[in-house]
Amino acid sequence: MSEIVNLSSSLRSLNPKISPLVPPYRQTSSSFSRPRNFKYHSFTDKICLAAERIRAVDIQKQDGGLQELDDSPVSVELGPICGESHFDQVMEDAQKLGESVVIVWMAAWCRKCIYLKPKLEKLAAEFYPRLRFYHVDVNAVPYRLVSRAGVTKMPTIQLWRDGQKQAEVIGGHKAHFVVNEVREMIENDSIT
C-alpha cells in the first residue's frame, strides 16, 4: 500500500533539482515494530519533507533571527528482547551504566498492546537517552522468562533497576491513563 507523493510546483521551485515525484517509503509489517525508510528533501532552510509525512517548518523568527530547532526524536522505537539471555544482557548492561530500564510485555494478538505501543514510543522519546525502553512478545520468548518477570496480563509495563523489578503498570484501561501512570512510575523512580 504505497503511494507516490506528487510535489506541488511551489515546493519544486524551492529546490529545482528535486524530482516532482517522491518515491514511496519502505514499510514492512511486523507484530510490533515497523521499520521505516524515509526519503528526505531540504528546501532552503524553510521546509523539511519526508515521504511519510510532509511538515513545513519556518526557522526564521519575525525579528529576522534564526530559531533553534529541537532535534530530539518524536518517538523512539522500543528495542525487542528475544529471549532470556538477551533479557539478562539488557539488565546487565543497564546495571553497569546505573540506568533503569522499562520493559513492555506484549502479545501480537493483544489489541490494547498494539494500540498502546506507539504512545509508549512517544513517551520513550521524552526520556531518551537516559532511559531505555524495550518490548517483549510473550509468545516469542520462553514461558520461564514471562513467569520470572511475574507477568500475568497484557500489556504490562515494568520498571527494572539493578536487575530487580521496581514497579509495574498493567495497561488494561485507556491508553492516555496508562501512559500517565508509566510517566509517574518513571518519575517516582528518578526521585528515589
Curated annotation (Swiss-Prot):
SUPFAM superfamilies in alphabetical order: Thioredoxin-like
Signal peptide from the UniProt entry: none
Interval spanned by the transit peptide: 1-55
Keyword list, A-Z: Chloroplast, Disulfide bond, Electron transport, Plastid, Redox-active center, Transit peptide, Transport
Record domain Thioredoxin: where: 66-191
Short name of one Pfam family: Thioredoxin
Entry similarity comment: Belongs to the thioredoxin family.
Species, as recorded: Arabidopsis thaliana (Mouse-ear cress)
Entry's Gene Ontology cellular component terms: chloroplast stroma
Residues at the catalytic site: 110 (nucleophile), 113 (nucleophile)
Subcellular location: Plastid, Chloroplast stroma
Protein name: Thioredoxin-like 3-2, chloroplastic
InterPro entries according to UniProt: Thioredoxin-like_sf, Thioredoxin_domain, WCRKC1/2
Disulfide bond residue pairs: 110-113
Origin: domain of life: Eukaryota
GO biological process, one term: cell redox homeostasis
Purpose: Probable thiol-disulfide oxidoreductase that may participate in various redox reactions.
